[in-house]
Amino acid sequence: EIAAAGGHSLLMVGPPGSGKSMLAQRFAGLLPPMPIEDALESAAMASLAGRFDLAGWAQRPTGQPHHSASAVALVGGGSPPRPGEISLAHHGVLFLDELPEFPRAALEALREPLETGTITIARAARRAEFPARFQLIAAMNPCPCGYLGSATRACRCSPDQVSRYQGKLSGPLLDRIDLHIEVPSLPAQDLLNAPPGESTSDIAARSLAARTLAMARQGCANAALQGQAIDAQAHLSEGAASLLQKAATKLGWSGRSTHRSLKVARTIADLAGSDTIEAAHVAEAVQYRRVLKES
């Protein structure tokens, strides 16, 4: 809900069968309707790649490349240059399952578009820039066997194996993902006896209301705020500012991590209908930047 409301990128960490893929596939249904300008840009990208389908007009694109995809498949290339999966997901969702299994070059290629919303391709004497303002939804197991921290099965991996597996994701890439959450597996009894959850339409309505607040205030989603605009639109209370500073110092966050948590806190405040970011909003945002080895 927070990711949909603010346009934030999301990393889900959990054992096999915990519902990560299902959550990602349902995510596009929580996003607000596409404005006509966004629909035209998305259609232009699809047309360049020969994938435009009139039946998909004004529907947010959802890309799900396999983890064997190369960096060129993700960012684009060729002569003349054609857009890759990240540009085809412009104004939509890019779902990367089994994130550490992607080639390192492909993962590092995500850093530029996650920061700027564009991707530059240079091939021989040609240079092309494509839009790539997508929402990254990534999923991964916490370790090679998948069951680190699971309540249902014991993990078979050594600490060294876990460290190597999680080390496939670089710090700069993780820095650019706003929300890091754990998706625990439920015992069969709890799963079968679980009460009905909220409907997609109810959650989508709340997300749309929060997104509308942000658009009226600053003209873009909270995740798209850059530089001084972040501080200008934050409206932190004194207690919230103090808590964020203490958390950033204690957890050793970079300036980028701190700003990304601040943007998440702004979205949480919007969902609560609050003009000011309070300490409770910051405390919740801090919880969503989990360190993988703590999972």
Where are these regions (language model features)?
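Conserved alpha-helical scaffold flanking the Walker A/P-loop in AAA+ ATPase domains
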Residues: 1-2, 55-56, 60-61, 66-94, ...
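Conserved inter-motif catalytic segment of the P-loop NTP-binding fold
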Residues: 38-70, 77-78, 225-229, 234-235, ...
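Walker B catalytic acidic pair
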Residues: 91, 97-98, 109
